[in-house]
């Protein structure tokens, strides 16, 4: 369990809070808006109304005691930059900030953010990849080059063993697991025959995965 300082309770911040609560973490939530703070109270450990760009207020939170500080402020980039800088100056261990553009991302990284999330761009990329192919069911980028895909097994692969396909050597594609009725089966080997009633999780270079499954 981690202690999380979450600043900004717009739609993104509220969704982050809900997931953190589901995962069992301790959450201190902060927003200027009293209504937002009151609405989030049932799913967080504590919540305060305040201006995170005010250093006096921020000091009262004990920034250095949190494992992660998440700056989820939307539509007020000046406050986001100020908050990010102050958090780092006050000894925050890990600052994760939200950006809405590439320019904002670069600015946040220069001003104290350890990591930056770009939810609109990430969701746009996921949507474009997911719905431009009949075979791709889910997509998780790992870095700028590699991704996990959940894909339907191509008809030409059905009935063949993983070893016979040899896609790791020929295409750099690693078949990591099969998935049937929502359950993962990671007990696979070169001798595993690919059936027609499940999907598979594959790992590889994003461009190669798109070439193999994106049509």
Describe the residue ranges of each PLM region.
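Cytosolic regulatory regions of ion transport systems
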Residues: 1-215
